[in-house]
Swiss-Prot record:
The keyword Repeat applies. InterPro entries: DM10_dom, EF-hand-dom_pair, EFHC1/EFHC2/EFHB. This is EF-hand domain-containing family member C2. Microtubule inner protein (MIP) part of the dynein-decorated doublet microtubules (DMTs) in cilia axoneme, which is required for motile cilia beating. Residues 75-182, 226-368, 430-537 form the DM10 domain.
Length: 750
């Protein structure tokens, strides 16, 4: 019973609609009025009464996420079904029907179907694509509709253009997809065997194939190994024959066809023709030379007889020998026969494989699992060197001159080491001269205090000795030994071998050197020499800081005693001690294990840097002297400019700004002197208090005493070099850092 049409009982069914137009059902076709489409809806897109629209494509259930079109969501997704077809065979006694196997591909993106028939060897049937990709309609009377994904399942039959295909299975992807869209899958079916193909297979199992049907396919090997060559370095030792020698070869084995090529490595000035090819490319027999074969004896197939051919084909032919009687079997070298250490027969010549390249090693390691590639030397064993004996030194000239006179008929001068001279000769500020200060070891009281400068020239290993001149010493001083090489003592004078000379490695602080019978003990060295020795620790091991520290670490059991001794020596708690105190403590603790060179190396590492800057009062006095000479008094202008530049009113300006003002106002000071003066007034932020700076420079307001020239002769002290060596290499040593690095002691333990 329907409700009465009263307010509150009726509902507006047009709420939410946006389309209210009528569909155009009628039109013209070839100027004839007719119904254009029966599938068009009514007003607003609603279906007419009793109207059912058939879906044109597969309708998939909606899921979560974005609604992408089917041609995007199912791109490159294909359902694969296995099917077969019973094809009737007429007018043939061997078979009544034949089972043909097919692959049905359903493309989800546009509901197209493709049917392919896999290839069967020697089937005699057209195979490949049976139905090209297209939308396939239902069989009549529903041929106005097309197959969709819901029409496929396992163990069903589908009709494509009158041919019935029975689907018996599908791939796992197809099964999962059909389950997801709600299709209940049938159990897989069994595909029947083709009776004719089964009969042929059983027949072929009992057939003895003829040899002419053997395959000689070399294309696969050629494509796989083309351009890949095994290379071995080999040796043919022919030294046992008359005028024979050892000859080196390079063997190339071509993997694409198993051929071998050998090329000879010709050394320079060998006397042989410049023909590197020793064996042209070809297969190498293992047992050669085999002899001379008759024409046609070496063939791939043996021809039994020639016949005229079949009458219907009108073509000539030949019969091949099935049993190949009398065929010559040849055994050639393959890659399995080649290895390092193997000896191969190259047409009667024994060739030893000594080594191979990296590609060959990788090939054998990958294919055969070979890991031993120990090479064999191709070089001949070294002949014992005949030592040439020379007559002894005559005593005239140098040993090198006597040697050169014995080498040839015409005496030639000795060739010096020019490369060493060019590398180690002095240039610029680099002198390449090691200078040591030493004393003469003698029992004469007058010569005990004599100091000498021993210079070693690295360019030619020569030594010169110079004695500084001292007033009222009783010694003339000057050159003690001119520059020359010094022989080591204890050598025979007249001998055939060269004498040994003093080298740079034998000179270090604390060493005793015998120079032509005079014994010198090296006491100290200049700064360049110490730096050179520390930079070349491979030649001067006593200047190696790590080795010296390692000796002290061996005395770790005495660390507490060493700490107490240093603490007692540093009674002012300055954490530094003089060098002599540092040396005496270490020498007493190590009991002579360290030499002076090692002590100096350690002391230089922990030394207190000396400030070499000139006195500020001296700099101001020099600046006032220059201002007086140039009558420069305009210092108030500098302060006014600085106040103008100081926008933040801090009273300080950057150093570069004050330097720019000084240069722009032509302050009569040199660049280096001005930089030195500015550095003495700048703070850690590189800023200068301009009022203090220019007030100090104002020689009118703040005069200083006149600058006095230093005396010509200055009293000798430890810090000034006047021709005599300084008695100590460094002034103070930071012993606290030394104890922390060597023994791991902390500051609070002292």
């Amino acid at each position: 019973m329907a409700l009465p049409f009263l307010p509150g009982n009726s509902f507006n069914r047009n709420i939410g609609k946006e389309r209210f137009h009528k569909s155009q059902h009628w039109g013209f076709c070839n100027n004839v009025r007719m119904l254009v489409s029966e599938n068009k809806p009514g007003v607003g897109g609603d279906l007419l009464y009793g109207q059912k629209i058939k879906p044109k494509h597969s309708v998939f259930p909606k899921g979560d996420g974005t609604d992408a079109p089917s041609w995007v969501a199912f791109d490159k997704q294909v359902l694969s079904f296995d099917a077969y077809l019973e094809d009737e065979i007429s007018d043939k006694r061997q078979e009544i029907f034949r089972i043909r196997y097919y692959k049905i591909y359903f493309y989800l993106e546009d509901d197209t179907i493709q049917v392919n028939e896999p290839e069967v060897i020697n089937s005699g049937l057209p195979q490949g694509t049976s139905i090209r990709r297209q939308r396939i309609p239902y069989p009549p009377p529903n041929d106005d509709q097309f197959y969709t994904v819901y029409d496929f399942n396992i163990n069903i039959s589908v009709v494509f253009y009158g041919r019935t295909f029975k689907i018996y299975d599908c791939d796992p992807f197809t099964k999962n997809f059909l389950k997801k869209i709600g299709i209940k899958l049938n159990p897989p079916g069994q595909c029947p065997l083709d009776p004719y193909m089964k009969m042929r297979r059983e027949t072929l199992e009992f057939v003895d194939p003829f040899r002419p049907y053997q395959s000689f396919d070399t294309l696969k090997r050629f494509i796989q190994y083309d351009g890949k060559v095994l290379r071995f370095f080999c040796l043919w030792d022919d030294s046992t024959s008359l005028f024979g020698d050892r000859r080196e070869f390079v063997l190339h084995y071509f993997l694409c066809d198993g051929t071998v090529e050998i090329r000879e490595v010709l050394p320079s000035n060998s006397g042989r023709d410049a023909m590197s090819s020793f064996l042209r490319r070809g297969k190498l027999p293992k047992y050669g030379p085999p002899g001379i074969y008759q024409p046609g004896q070496i063939t791939d197939r043996a021809v039994l007889n020639v016949y005229g051919g079949l009458s219907e084909w009108r073509a000539d032919g030949y019969l091949l020998d099935k049993y190949q009687l009398g065929k010559v079997e040849q055994d050639f070298y393959t890659d399995q026969d080649l290895s390092i250490g193997a000896t191969i027969n190259v047409w009667g010549r024994k060739v030893l494989l000594c080594d191979c390249d990296e590609f060959t090693k990788t090939y054998y390691r990958t294919k055969y699992g070979v890991d031993n590639f120990t090479p064999i030397s191709c070089k001949p064993p070294h002949l014992p060197k005949i030592e040439r004996k020379y007559p002894p030194y005559t005593g005239f000239g140098s040993e090198e001159d006597s040697f050169r006179s014995c080498v040839g008929l015409k005496p030639t001068p000795h060739r010096k080491n020019f490369k060493k001279f060019m590398e180690l000769d002095s240039f610029g500020n680099i002198s390449n001269i090691l200078r040591y200060f030493g004393k003469l070891i003698t029992h004469k009281c007058a010569d005990v205090d004599r100091i000498f400068v021993i210079a070693f020239y690295l360019s030619d290993d020569t030594i010169s000795v110079f004695e500084p001149i001292e007033n009222n010493s009783g010694n003339a001083g000057g050159m003690f030994l001119k520059r020359s090489r010094v022989k080591k003592p204890g050598q025979e004078v007249f001998k055939s071998e060269f004498s040994e000379y003093i080298k740079a490695e034998e000179l270090y602080i604390g060493a005793t050197v015998n120079i032509n019978g005079y014994l010198f003990i090296l006491l100290n060295a200049d700064e360049y020499t110490l730096n050179y020795m520390e930079n070349n620790t491979d030649k001067f091991p006593y200047s190696n800081f790590e080795l010296a520290i390692q000796k002290l670490k061996q005395e770790k059991s005495k660390s507490r005693e060493i700490t107490q001794v240093f603490a007692a020596a540093d009674y002012n708690h300055t954490k530094v001690v003089p060098y002599n105190t540092f040396r005496d403590i270490l020498m007493s603790i190590t009991m002579g294990k360290l030499i002076d060179q090692e002590l100096i190396t350690i002391a230089r590492h922990y030394r207190v840097p000396e400030i070499m800057d000139p006195d500020l009062a001296y700099l101001i006095a020099r600046a006032h002297e220059k201002f007086k000479k140039n009558i420069f008094e305009n210092f108030d202008m500098f302060i006014y400019n600085c106040v103008y530049e100081d926008r933040e009113k801090k009273g300080v300006l950057p150093t570069k700004d004050i330097r720019r003002m000084c240069k722009s106002s032509r302050l009569p000071l040199d660049d280096d002197f001005l930089d030195c003066l500015l550095s003495r007034f700048e703070d850690k932020d590189h800023q200068i208090n301009y009022e203090i700076f220019f007030s100090v420079l104002n020689w009118r307001m703040n005069p200083t005493p006149d600058l006095q020239a230093p005396p010509y002769l200055k009293e000798k002290c430890e810090d000034v070099w006047v021709g005599m060596p300084s008695p100590i290499p460094v002034k103070y040593v930071r012993y606290l850092d030394f104890l922390i690095d060597v023994y791991g002691l902390e500051d609070n333990m002292l």
